């Protein structure tokens, strides 16, 4: 029901796509060896009905692959999961890497760089557009792989939900700092996180 409300809002406000996070099984075991299943929705998320409804309203769905930093688990499923999205008519994908990589590797390590390259190439084979969160720095890869639409790589306003937030100067500096390296996905606001309604 909530998914359809967001699709209706997007259609009414000329928003081209809606991102749904947390629809796939595995969130309750974050960080576990087999935590996320990238093709198995929770029982209350009917992916076929949601895609059908979105298409009827002229809105695209952006899929979400949060890895929690568990790269081996994601790479085992990546090709099949992207094909699964393609089969469902989903061609936009946000990847996420909130969490430590295995064996102490850092996001910007050679291990991380190689992984991101595999993701971009696999997505291209499946004609998927990518938005990477917790990415490596922009390297110009989108010149070779234009399906690499954007990456986060900045402290967005979601930080206002659990911390003192960002000062106003942070937001106005980003166009002159972070954006010099390429397109940026930025979280511009936070919904009511207290759930008072």
Where are these regions (language model features)?
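An acidic-aromatic substrate-binding cleft motif
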Residues: 1-8, 13, 17
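Aromatic- and carboxylate-enriched substrate-binding clefts and catalytic-loop regions
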Residues: 21-196
């Amino acid at each position: 029901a909530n998914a359809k409300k967001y699709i209706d809002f997007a259609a009414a406000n000329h928003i081209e796509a809606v991102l749904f996070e947390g629809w796939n099984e595995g969130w309750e075991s974050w960080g576990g060896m087999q935590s996320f299943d990238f093709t198995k929705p929770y029982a209350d998320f009917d992916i076929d009905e949601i895609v059908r409804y979105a298409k009827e309203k002229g809105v695209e769905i952006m899929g979400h692959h949060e890895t929690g930093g568990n790269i081996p688990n994601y790479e085992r499923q990546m090709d099949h999961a992207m094909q699964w999205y393609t089969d469902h008519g989903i061609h936009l994908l946000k990847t996420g890497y909130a969490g430590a990589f295995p064996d102490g590797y850092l996001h910007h390590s050679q291990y991380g760089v190689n992984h991101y390259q595999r993701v971009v190439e696999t997505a291209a084979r499946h004609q998927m557009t990518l938005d990477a969160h917790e990415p490596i720095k922009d390297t110009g890869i989108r010149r070779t792989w234009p399906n690499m639409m954007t990456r986060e790589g900045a402290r967005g306003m979601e930080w206002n939900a659990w911390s003192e937030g960002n000062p106003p100067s942070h937001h106005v500096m980003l166009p002159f700092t972070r954006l010099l390296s390429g397109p940026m996905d930025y979280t511009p606001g936070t919904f009511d996180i207290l759930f008072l309604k």
